[in-house]
Amino acid sequence: SLSTKDKETVKAFWSKVSGKSADIGNDALSRMLVVYPQTKTYFSHWKELTPGSAPVRKHGMTVMKGVGDAVSKIEDLTAGLMELSELHAFTLRVDPANFKILSHNILVVFAIMFPNDFTPDVHVSMDKFLAALGRALSEKYR
């Protein structure tokens, strides 16, 4: 679970990086689709799945808006993200294992884009936060 220090660290880091969330989302989703090609099955309805394409950029931004929303609901992610959990479980039918894959790619992009701010302590807190976010999104799968 997230400690008070983790929550403070996540909020502080997010305030530094959120202005670049479109770029973060685009790069993280682009990487996921290339490095983990099995994830493309969820996006087969898109005309183009290449890194940086319009649909990838758009969904990357959507994902990062969700991350930003989760930061604002960090005190109760499960209740705060119930609608998103239902969407992913019942409508989109996304395998929850993919939340871990995307979280990993988001962390990679943080490290690349913010090498001075993404310290080991920030890395730990963001990793714990993204894992908690994934668990909250998986809530309706039970």
UniProtKB/Swiss-Prot annotation:
Gene3D superfamilies: Globins. CDD domains: Hb-alpha-like. Belongs to the globin family. Residues 1-142 form the Globin domain. The modification N-acetylserine is found at S1. Heme b binds at H88. One of its GO terms (molecular function) is oxygen carrier activity. GO terms for biological process: hydrogen peroxide catabolic process. Keywords: Acetylation, Heme, Iron, Metal-binding, Oxygen transport, Transport. Pfam families: Globin. Hb 2 is a heterotetramer of two alpha-2 and two beta-2 chains. This fish has two hemoglobins: Hb1 (major) and Hb2 (about 15-20% of the total). They display the Root effect and the alkaline Bohr effect, which is enhanced by organophosphate and to a lesser extent by chloride. Involved in oxygen transport from gills to the various peripheral tissues. This is Hemoglobin subunit alpha-2. O2 binds at H59. Red blood cells. One of its GO terms (cellular component) is haptoglobin-hemoglobin complex.
